[in-house]
Structure formats: C-alpha cells, structure tokens
Amino acid sequence: MVGGHAEELNFNLESPHKWSFEWGWNNESYSKSDIHFKGIDHQFTLHGVRATDTQKTLTPLSLFNTYLNPGKITIPQTNARIAYQINSDTAFALNLDHMKYVVSDSQTVSASGQYLQKNYQNSDKQYLSPAFMHYEHTDGLNVVSLEYEKKYPINHLPGNLKMQFFALLGAGIVIPKSNVTMTMLGQVRNDKFHLAGTNLDVAGGLEFDFSKEYFARTSYKVGRVHLSDVVTSARQDKASQKFNYQEASLTFGLRF
C-alpha cells in the first residue's frame, strides 16, 4: 500500500496531457524611444521619450474588482498561452502578451523636424502634455508570438514538490490599439486595432507542478519591439518607434 500510494503521488510530465493553457498577469518596464511622426502637415521626431505600463497595484479590492472580474478582463495587463508538449522537455506555444504602453506626460524631450508652422531647430525641446499630444497603446500593446521552449527538471526537492526551470525564444507580431491624440494638429485618434510591427524575445522562469493537470509559472522576459506602422489619427497619419522591454509575469495553467 505504501509503495502504491507513493507511486500515485509521484506524478511527472510523461503523461497523456500534451496540451496546456495558461492565464495570468504581467508588469513591464520600457527603454526610452525615439518616436517618428509623419503626415501631410508634419514630419518630426521626439527623442528619448519615456513610457510606463499601467498595471494596478494588487490589493484585496483590486484582486476581486479588477484582476478576477470577468467584466474587466482586458483592464489588467494579461497573458494567455496555449502550448503543445512534444516530449517531457520540449514545447511549442502560441502566446499573447496584452501589455500597456503610456508615454509619460510632463516630460521634456529633444525634438527635430516640423509640424504646421513650427520648425524645431537644433537641440530644441518639447514639453509633452495633453495640450500638445498624448500617445499610448493602452487598449493593448498586443504581442502575439510563437515560442520554442525547453524545460529542465530541478531534482532532489523535498517531499513531492515538482519544479522545473524553463527557457524559451519567441518571435511574432504586434497588433496594438493605439490611443494617440494629436492635439497640436487638431486631429482625433484612430482607435482601431492595427498590425503595427514585430517582436523578438527570450524568457526564463520556474514552473511549479501541483499535479499532472495544474501548475503555475513565474517568468522574466526581455524583448525588443519594432513598431514601423503605428496609426496616429483618423486620417491615417503614421508613427514609428523601437524600444526594449522587460516583463515579469505570473500565470496559472491547466494541462489537458
């Protein structure tokens, strides 16, 4: 009986559960970025622009009001992932990182180029505020990636604890819904989903197995986004930018 009980508890990943689904949340930090704007009456660049994410602080109230509220499913920064386990240590996955990117108001940056009758000279500065412009991807800096993952079991853990280290490579596309208000041009925002660029990333983390079916993962990711075709107004003005990011995430998953 003792041996049979031990065998029952000694689950591992050599099981018929080939597919898995995860859902969770993320936090980001972003590098500074040069943002290039172009349209029929403007062509200018804002240099070294700072941006942040918008994840809400986790409190008992926000946990149930925001994070676990089905009616506000897109308000937090979320992760969704479906993976196929080829064998015990290799998987392919389709991953969605629903991140948010907001250019910080009340910062002063260098500017070059021109808009309407305004010409920036060498070393001119521009104060960023809603009276000038507001720029964000908050209905999603949505990164859809294909991932290749390897797992490495961590041995000699106490009791029945099962833990693995994983590392992955990801590449994909970025489909933001950019909320850009070009106040100084009198233009309203486009406010539509649009294929705007590409993403490359690498990540690593720990996977905790509660059973054959249920698990949790913590991960740290670094990536680079190249947005070559951001739509900034209803008349289809454009912007482009590149930036690096770091992401920490917590997800919960089910194998099936």
Question: Model features per residue range: what roles?
Answer:
Residues 65-68, 130-137, 184-193, 233-241:
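Extracellular loop and loop/strand-boundary signature of outer-membrane beta-barrel proteins
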Residues 33-36, 44-45, 205-256:
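Predominantly the C-terminal beta-signal and adjacent terminal strand-loop region
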Residues 81-181, 253:
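Gram-negative (and chloroplast) outer-membrane scaffold detector with strong preference
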Residues 7-18, 88-89, 153-165, 210-216:
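Short loop/turn motifs that connect adjacent beta-strands in outer-membrane beta-barrel proteins
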Residues 17, 74-78, 138-144, 163, ...:
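Residues that define the transmembrane beta-barrel architecture of outer-membrane proteins
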Residues 34-40, 105-111, 177-187, 229-235:
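Outer-membrane beta-barrel translocator domains and adjoining extracellular loop/strand segments
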